[in-house]
Regions:
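Catalytic grooves of carbohydrate-active enzymes
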Residues: 285-322
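A generic local structural motif
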Residues: 2, 128-130, 276-280
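Sec-dependent N-terminal signal peptides of Gram-positive bacterial secreted proteins and lipoproteins
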Residues: 4-23
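Basic side chains
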Residues: 2-5, 235, 312
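N-terminal pre-catalytic segment of deacetylase/amide-hydrolase enzymes
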Residues: 20-144, 150-156, 163, 309-310, ...
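Hydrophobic alpha-helical membrane context
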Residues: 14-17, 158, 209, 306
């Protein structure tokens, strides 16, 4: 009788352990198959808005290892370009005074006078730089993003752009490109521009002409070697430039891309919701606008589709920077 009780107890323990094991396996299976789950959402307690929450890339999506001659896009690697620096000592005396770019807040479907003056200054002085399309007769818009680092929303942005068939330019630093090659390859293969935002994101007016060229060339070399890609569009880190810097960028074959529409979207501690992003951007749109958004902003990622739809309803046409008129 005692032996029967012991056997029953042992059988009960085995059944309990088996049930626990199956439960744990189910939890693990749930964690390892995020594709079967809907994208998580979060509700902003201040506004009551529900927004999508970006999830981190799974381990299997991390940076692959390239073999000799391969690129992340499958395109053939491009030959490296030697940037010959004209007047490396700036003997011509071009101003090296730091200018913090200012564009003004556009209202009423017209660019702010500051943006108009900026474009006139670039054109009148022969700089290969632009912030505003004053030539096209269409209501053109040029959508650009600054991508200093990855915050999990670039994939959502690319999905929206693909759905809406809208071209964009992504100005990336070298660490962003090195750490997220799949995202960069997707940008390129889906027809977007990957712009040059420098290697280390320094303030260009503090650099020599040779150092400026090295910052641009380092990024260009990496894109050519690892992605078989190069486009001559540059954006100054922090929007800080000088006459000397503008001249240098143009002298090595690049065009400096500024903007006429933007807002304070980069501060992750001060995101104000999808509706705020939509209202702010649409209120500032105007024909010929170069729009600057930051890819780290969840508000931008969630509002982008609505912004595009609204703009098109108003007769705007989205174009690539490759279509921007020569100044």
């Amino acid at each position: 009788m005692k032996r029967i009780r012991i056997c029953c107890l042992l059988l009960l323990c085995i059944l309990l352990c088996s049930a626990c094991g199956n439960s744990a396996a189910g939890d693990n299976a749930r964690q390892l198959n995020p594709a079967t789950e809907t994208q998580p959402e979060a509700t902003d307690p201040a506004t009551g808005e529900t927004t999508l929450v970006a999830t981190p890339l799974p381990v299997t999506a991390q940076k692959p290892v390239l073999q000799n001659g391969e690129t992340y896009t499958g395109l053939p690697a491009l030959a490296l370009q030697d940037f010959a620096v004209e007047d490396p000592e700036n003997t011509s005396g071009l101003s090296t005074e730091k200018v913090g770019y200012s564009y003004g807040v556009a209202k009423g479907g017209a660019p702010h006078e500051t943006s108009v003056q900026n474009q006139s200054y670039f054109s009148e002085n022969g700089y290969q730089a632009f912030c505003l399309d004053t030539v096209s007769e269409e209501k053109t818009l040029y959508l650009t993003f600054d991508c200093g680092y990855e915050n999990g929303y670039t994939e959502m942005i690319l999905d929206t752009l693909k759905e809406k068939n809208v071209p964009a330019a992504f100005f990336c630093t070298l660490p962003q490109v090195e750490d997220n090659p799949q995202l960069i390859a997707r940008m390129i293969t889906e027809g977007h521009i990957v712009g040059n935002h420098s290697v280390k994101h320094p303030s260009f007016p503090t650099l020599t002409r040779i150092e400026m060229a090295q910052e641009i060339q380092g990024m260009d070399d990496y894109l050519r070697t690892n992605f078989g890609y190069s486009e001559p569009f540059f954006r100054f880190p922090m929007g800080e430039y000088s006459d000397c810097a503008l001249d240098l960028v143009g002298s090595i074959g690049y065009r400096s891309v500024f903007w006429s529409v933007a807002y304070e979207d980069w501060d992750l501690d001060n995101q104000r919701g999808t509706q705020y992003a939509f209202d702010t951007v649409t209120a500032r749109l105007h024909p010929g606008a170069v729009i600057l958004l930051h890819s780290v902003s969840p508000d931008n990622a969630n509002a982008l589709g609505q912004i595009i739809d609204w703009a098109r309803e108003q007769g705007y046409v989205f174009k690539s920077l490759c279509d921007f008129p020569q100044t």
